[in-house]
Amino acid sequence: MKTKTRKILIKAVIVLLCVVALTLGWIIFDATVDRSGWRETRGGYYYRDFHGHQVTGWLETKYGRYYLGDDYKMVTGWKKIDGEVYWFAEDGTMATGWRDIAGERFYFDPQGRRQEGWVEMEGSRYYLNPSLVSGWQEIDGQRRWFSPDGSMVTGWLILDETYYLDENGVPLTGKADIDGSTYYFLEDGSCFHGWIDLEDGRYYFLPDGSMATHWQELNGKRFYFGDDGTLATGWLEDGEYRYYLTYDDGALTGAQILDDKAYYFTPDGIYVLLVNADNPLPKSYVPELVDLDGRHEVASVCLEPLKNMLTDCMKAGGEYSINNTYRSYAEQKDILQTRYERYLEADPELSDNDAWQKALAEVARPGTSEHQTGLCMDINGAGVESVPWLLEHCWEYGFILRFPEGKKDITGIVYEPWHFRYVGTRVSIPMRDSGLCLEEYLGAA
């Protein structure tokens, strides 16, 4: 009886152990059979190795890399392991490369470690903090701009303001030369445009941000800036032309008083020497003279334009003769004196004053004749008082008809179709188009 009872108990224990083994997964298998694989139980995934033992730590499979915690459970989401941060997808695979997680973008190296700070790839630089940043960021005390894809921007950046970012992504400040032009950037890096006073002078930066040089028309006024961009003031020589520039108004125009002396400027600001009864030259005035044809002298500035004009006139079939060019103060005085004496001799009863008035009606007072400038010349036609070709084309060479028809009330001189004055093409062409005489054009009428 006891033996029978013992056998029954042994069988019961064996059955119980089998039940427990099945429940806990303790099953004795053949050691040569692969028992590895995933099991889902107790709300998670677990992995058994070849021998059926549960795995912890890192797991490499052909599907990816996984991590199983101390509880044998497969990790998902964020996990810090040995001081490094990793992320595992819902299926447990470790993330590498770029990943979008909860609306943010992260980068993981090939070992799955989340990267922070600077990352460079495919020619672009990125900054992770720890997710990918974009827009303005202050890094190591310096501002940088990152595009929506996270790449750091260099070169020109146009937002509400315009910036230029150097090779390190840092906005330039102060004056900077870029692609052959100079720009000025404020302390916040924005590109400045408009007037600005710096330690070395006054500058103007155009709407595109580039520094103004040479002539610029700003708000209806003409200013001149040197090659270095500094605003020029005072007298300026630009080729054969002269200008007077002020700090606020740029090139002066019209009639101006400078150092108690009258000066006259065109609408473009070019100074023109005006000589008439109201604006006489001093006795000492002598221009730089050169020989024209062995008989006449002219101011050096008009020699080549005059030769070109006369040569082209001859080519066009025009015939001319030059009667007068430069005449000194003394020569003008002698001519007036001779004319005065001639009237007295012709009419002994003529009073001294009347003789002078008759002479002055025909001969300009010394200092008031344009011939003293060396810039004018009397050119007649062959047997006639004028050369039609010159009347039509003189403007193209920088000459004007000094005393045009219908302007005697302004110039004080009757129409003289032979009297030409050199002013340069920058003056002669717009003056021709204006229809004004010299006094009108210079604001002296």
Label the model's feature ranges.
Residues 2-271, 392:
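Extracellular adhesion/carbohydrate-binding repeat motifs centered on closely spaced tryptophans
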Residues 257-445:
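Extracytoplasmic cell-surface/polysaccharide-interacting catalytic and binding patches
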